[in-house]
Regions:
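Aromatic-lined carbohydrate-recognition surfaces of secreted/lumenal glycan-active proteins
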Residues: 144-156
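Active-site core of metal-dependent hydrolases
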Residues: 148-149, 179-180, 210
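Short secondary-structure boundary/hinge segments and terminal tails
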Residues: 50-51, 108, 155-157, 209
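Short, surface-exposed, charged loop/turn segments at secondary-structure junctions
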Residues: 113-118, 155-170, 212-217
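A metal-dependent hydrolase metal-coordination microenvironment
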Residues: 2-140, 181-194, 198-201
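Short, catalytically relevant binding-site loops at active-site mouths
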Residues: 105, 152-155, 186-187, 206-207
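C-terminal functional module detector
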Residues: 1-7, 19, 25-28, 43-46, ...
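Structural recognition of alpha->loop->beta junctions
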Residues: 161-186
Length: 271
């Protein structure tokens, strides 16, 4: 019945070996699918600036084994790979896979850095243009934009700051469709204080990142309905996906406490 669709467990920020992820696209889909928990994931590998110094250093450090981003001439093959694997994911796991990309601007001055996800991307978008031009191109393609980790992180202090979109929110908020309120282990409460539409995602690069903040939303398991739900941002919630403890039917604990923790547990009578 419309309006009473089940909540979907979603991760809209996932990287594979097409950029700097640890797993192949196929293995990534199998990892999510075999949990039996996930309904929707978006593959969002990096599109880098031509002179990305961090990626250049990374390629040297990995002896060229990792490219860290998708080149323009590789992009059609990237979308074809996602399309092929998305059919298998839906058939084998009833998992909806959305094609995306993270248009990544890493500059020497942290205040100029912006990472923008395009969900349901159709064509390559260059990172060598202004953030507002990137956002406008995402709109032209009919894709959905997500501002990635838009504020200072409290946990991963060694990673670069990507605050450009937030610092210029008065000018850009009309072009940004959704903001990350949580990214892996970090919460960005500032986005909710402004009442911006929000999501929570893992920024997945390796298997342990599976256990992190995720999005719950109420919609049919089809991209047009999910897009509409994300933009409306009414039946949307954040959930922390933990190993062996997430229950889609409620909040009941299904894991186990260690004996030491049981010894410290004190139950109070209901008032």
């Amino acid at each position: 019945m419309p309006g009473y669709e089940p909540f979907l467990l979603c991760d809209f920020h996932v990287h594979t070996r097409w950029s700097d992820g640890r797993l192949t696209l196929r293995d990534t889909i199998d990892l999510y699918g075999r949990t039996g928990k996930f309904d929707v994931i978006a593959i969002t590998d990096h599109i880098l600036m031509k002179r990305d110094l961090l990626a250049r250093a990374g390629r040297v450090a990995t002896l060229g084994r990792c490219t860290f981003g998708i080149a323009e001439d590789q992009f059609p093959a990237y979308l074809e790979d996602i399309a092929r694997e998305s059919e298998r994911a839906r058939r084998q796991y009833d998992l909806l896979v959305v094609p995306g990309a993270e248009i990544t601007q890493n500059k020497l001055r942290g205040k100029k850095n912006a990472h923008i996800i395009a969900l349901d991307i159709k064509r390559y978008i260059s990172a060598d243009q202004s953030p507002d031009d990137i956002l406008k191109e995402i709109r032209r393609q009919g894709a959905l934009s997500v501002a990635c980790h838009p504020h200072h992180r409290a946990v991963r202090r060694l990673e670069i700051s990507t605050c450009y979109l937030w610092d210029h929110r008065s000018a850009l908020s009309g072009l940004v469709d959704v903001w990350e309120a949580a990214n892996r282990d970090d919460l960005f409460s500032v986005t909710s204080l402004k009442h911006f539409p929000y999501v929570a995602s893992s920024d997945f690069h390796k298997p342990k990142h599976l256990y992190s903040w995720k999005t719950l939303l109420r919609a049919e398991k089809e991209w047009p309905a999910i897009r509409k739900a994300l933009c409306a941002n009414v039946d949307v919630a954040l959930t922390l996906f933990r190993k062996d403890s997430w229950n889609p039917n409620g909040t009941a604990w299904t894991g186990a406490l260690r004996p030491a923790a049981l010894g410290r547990l004190r139950l109070r009578p209901a008032r």
